[in-house]
């Protein structure tokens, strides 16, 4: 019996309807590279939201950005048990993928980040790490919007490991599920409420969205708050683009 695929993929193609090139011409043209963005939960709505949010980072002759969904993942990663459950499936996915030049783990808990880095010589980016580092380039103190209260302790442990807890103004929860943040009609309204609290009460000068499922709300949230809002998946893919481009320079 065939094993189920590790992931499903959303791939953008720009070559449909074009005239094929001679084989010799193709071999002389270096590949622009490929970045694989992995949603470690199995919610396809989240992956579609990521794919749409990453469209501004796709450009002519640039690396291909492919978003995929981890078939073995839970519907949402909301507990430490959820985090641990996807570590080895992510490692196997990275080891089995010989066509990607960089990987992005699109979950704010950065599940399996170090384990995946051990499994490949290619760069692996975690969105929490990249989102926080990007926020520090925009503000002295940043705030984080979490999906729920129980996520915050996990995020705090990670910030302590990074040595950056003193730069955190505060982290406040939406008290929503991952699925609700990706598709709920009230998500943006609630994010604006929490973002205003981070800005006015806690002194945050930038806000990091603490869940990949929030990706589609970055721009309207930034317009409402009037301070930088960081989508950590966009931040991670931007870093991956730089890594892939410079590796081919």
List where the protein language model places each region.
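Periplasmic-binding protein-like
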Residues: 37-38, 101-107, 203-211
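Short, glycine-/small-residue-rich phosphate/pyrophosphate-handling segment
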Residues: 45, 136-174, 245-249
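Glycine/small-residue-rich loop that forms an oxyanion/phosphate-binding "nest" at active or ligand-binding sites
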Residues: 87-134, 138, 144
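Short, flexible loop segments at boundaries between secondary-structure elements
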Residues: 231-248
């Amino acid at each position: 019996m065939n094993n189920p695929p590790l992931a499903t993929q959303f791939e953008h193609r720009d070559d449909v309807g074009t005239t094929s090139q001679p084989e010799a011409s193709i071999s002389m043209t270096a590949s622009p590279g490929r970045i694989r963005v992995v949603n470690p939960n199995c919610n396809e709505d989240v992956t579609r939201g990521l794919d749409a949010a990453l469209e501004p980072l796709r450009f002519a002759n640039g690396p291909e950005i492919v978003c995929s969904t981890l078939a073995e993942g839970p519907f949402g990663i909301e507990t430490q048990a959820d985090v641990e459950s996807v570590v080895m499936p992510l490692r196997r996915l990275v080891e089995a993928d010989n066509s990607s030049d960089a990987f992005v783990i699109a979950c704010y808990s950065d599940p399996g980040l170090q384990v995946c880095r051990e499994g490949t010589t290619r760069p692996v980016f975690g969105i929490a790490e990249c989102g926080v580092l990007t926020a520090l380039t925009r503000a002295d103190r940043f705030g984080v919007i979490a999906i729920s209260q129980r996520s915050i302790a996990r995020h705090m442990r990670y910030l302590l490991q990074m040595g950056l807890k003193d730069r955190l103004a505060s982290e406040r929860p939406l008290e929503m599920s991952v699925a609700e943040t990706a598709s709920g009609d009230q998500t943006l309204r609630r994010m604006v409420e929490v973002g205003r609290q981070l800005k006015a009460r806690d002194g945050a000068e930038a806000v990091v969205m603490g869940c990949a499922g929030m990706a589609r709300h970055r721009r309207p949230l930034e317009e409402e708050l009037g301070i930088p809002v960081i989508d950590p998946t966009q931040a991670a893919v931007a870093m991956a683009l730089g890594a892939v481009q410079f590796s081919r320079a």
